[in-house]
Amino acid sequence: NGRKEDGLKAFRWILENKRYYGIRVVNISVGTTCRRAEDHRVLIAGVEQLWDAGLVVVAAAGNQGPKAGSVTAPGSSRKIITVGSSDLLTGRTAISGRGPTFECVCKPDLVAPGNHVLACAPGADNGYGVKSGTSMSTPLVAGAAALMLEKNPELTNVQIKMKLKESARDMGLPKNQQGWGELDLERFMEL
């Protein structure tokens, strides 16, 4: 529920302010199917610029599943870490985005729980509501990356991505659904 221009403006702000605020991890819990190929390319270029600047970029796979090729942009970027929802992969609630991308990249990279998550909900009486989707899964992986960087601040974004891959728990599903598997925080932090 936003405009591509707003996302690109946010990416520029992050690049301009990452040193001042010590930004190391970027969570992107949005995605679009992009009606025009150019919009898709612009969003991909924006997140890849963040990645190339050394930031750990984690984006949602989107909720367009269960069909193949349903990962949304910017999660369809080859470089960044794309997250699906481990509890929205099968059955009637199989909405988690699946690869491959338009560029034949196997996505998502991994999955994390994202069903019935208590989260901030503007307009709710107490400010909270129960939400579901890959936008709820993505912050779990971004938070795991932040914990690892707190423990090992010298790690690069590529090293974080590889540690997530090495520590993910195989769910026995096709790679275009689960990627490397489900986030295993304990195993990840032990690497």
Model-derived features with residue positions:
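Solvent-exposed, polar/charged alpha-helical surfaces in well-ordered, non-transmembrane soluble domains
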Residues: 9-12, 45-49, 81, 142, ...
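A generic alpha-helix surface/boundary motif
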Residues: 33, 142-143, 183
